[in-house]
Amino acid sequence: MAELPGPFLCGALLGFLCLSGLAVEVKVPTEPLSTPLGKTAELTCTYSTSVGDSFALEWSFVQPGKPISESHPILYFTNGHLYPTGSKSKRVSLLQNPPTVGVATLKLTDVHPSDTGTYLCQVNNPPDFYTNGLGLINLTVLVPPSNPLCSQSGQTSVGGSTALRCSSSEGAPKPVYNWVRLGTFPTPSPGSMVQDEVSGQLILTNLSLTSSGTYRCVATNQMGSASCELTLSVTEPSQGRVAGALIGVLLGVLLLSVAAFCLVRFQKERGKKPKETYGGSDLREDAIAPGISEHTCMRADSSKGFLERPSSASTVTTTKSKLPMVV
């Protein structure tokens, strides 16, 4: 008995399996799919198999940059029933329900930026395991650029360099950036400017007074454009020094004013302290003792050869002591 060649036997076996419905084949588009923000995306998926009681369809989703093993289901069809699940459950459905005639296309309404990623269409129909029943579709939600933010850094004096930056927080595909100068002033020469359309940065070198003006950044992708503006003012270096000196003088005047205020306040507080007073019973060094008259003092002094009157006419004198004399 002649033996059949190996390749012929494999081909015959494959044909038999296909005819008998023992092979599951899933077909999806090879090109990525793009859908504008807010529209409905149709993710086409077809299959070939003999649908039986064990037929099951599953759609799942994985975010960009993550492995397929981290995908999570968004829709099931099994035992004749459809089960949407996950955060997209209210926006997913099947183009044909039940999907039992070879069409398993998924509809996703009101697409969001977070819907961008890879979608997996998987058909299971035990015991049909001969081929891979899995198809992958990459979806990108197209989003126009958001209003960009313009900023500036660096020295803006004559001869200096500065960098103008522009960036949009949203936009898919990623927008490109272009800087233009407004008005009738000439655009800086290419030798004094470097522009990066990807990062949105414009570097201006060797600034001059004519570099002053309003610059506009335009962010653009296939969904639209948005812009922001920035005014650049280039100054003479001396103006910067004068401004610094003026600020220093103002600070010095402020410090002197504070010091003068503190000194006046201190003097006022010091003047409020109470002065010492003398009571009626206090004796002065030049007062005349009770019982001694002014004439007695004069006779005593005359014995020494001179007369001396009290230093003050207001000195109280007593001619007769009211105190008893002790002999």
Curated annotation (Swiss-Prot):
Residues 265-327 are cytoplasmic. It is found in: Membrane. Residues 24-137 form the Ig-like V-type domain. One of its GO terms (biological process) is lipid metabolic process. One of its GO terms (cellular component) is membrane. The keyword Disulfide bond applies. Pfam families: Ig_3, V-set. Residues 24-243 are extracellular. Residues 1-23 form the signal peptide. Residues 144-233 form the Ig-like C2-type domain. Highly expressed in stomach, colon, prostate, trachea and thyroid glands and weakly in bladder and lung. Residues 305-327 are annotated as: Disordered. Residues 311-327 have a biased composition (Low complexity). The keyword Disulfide bond applies. Keywords: Disulfide bond, Glycoprotein, Immunoglobulin domain, Lipid metabolism, Membrane, Repeat, Signal, Transmembrane, Transmembrane helix. This is V-set and immunoglobulin domain-containing protein 2. The gene is VSIG2.
